[in-house]
Design a protein with these regions (language model features):
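Long, hydrophobic N-terminal alpha-helical segment
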Residues: 1-48
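A short, surface-exposed helix-loop junction/capping segment
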Residues: 49-61
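A sequence-level detector of short, solvent-exposed, charge-rich linear segments
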Residues: 38, 42-45, 49-52, 91-98, ...
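Residue-level detector of functional hotspots within protein domains
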Residues: 5, 70, 91-93
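Amphipathic coiled-coil alpha-helices
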Residues: 29-32, 36, 43, 61-71, ...
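Glycine-rich, aromatic-bearing surface loops/beta-hairpins
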Residues: 77, 81-133
């Protein structure tokens, strides 16, 4: 059954070919995002920041965390502008809004996969992945 355009959640929809064509560009962005997120959640960095913060706002640890935060923000905005949905930074899991038989679904890709080969309903998530073929 076809979903009326007014009820669609996403303006942009990808075909599998379009999504696959973006992977060479998106994969390095996802890797950079994961690295920047790791810097933000690094326990040693947080301990150093906690020790340095009372003196003057954090010094080098504060700068490092600030730079990592800005990098995460910049990369997430770039991915959103590209029309993709980041589902899990650690896994490198992203979804591409798509239309399947007239209804909105997600094409699903995880860092390390050669191509977009799965899809799932908008509310199903990773466990609901089904092969495209």
């Amino acid at each position: 059954m076809s979903q009326p355009e007014a009820e669609r959640l996403y303006q942009r929809h990808f075909t599998a070919a379009e999504a696959n064509g973006l992977l060479p560009t998106l994969a390095p962005v996802i890797e950079r995002l994961r690295d920047a997120k790791d810097e933000l959640t690094d326990e040693e960095m947080h301990a150093a920041l906690g020790e340095a913060a009372p003196g003057n706002g954090g010094g080098e640890p504060g700068r490092t965390v600030g730079v990592a935060f800005l990098e995460v923000r910049k990369l997430l905005l770039a991915l959103a502008e590209a029309g993709v949905v980041v589902k899990d930074i650690d896994r490198g899991l992203i979804d591409f809004p798509a239309l399947l038989e007239g209804r909105e679904v997600f094409l699903c890709w995880e860092l390390g996969e050669d191509e977009v080969g799965f899809w799932h309903e908008l509310d199903a998530g990773y466990p609901g992945r089904r092969p495209l073929d």
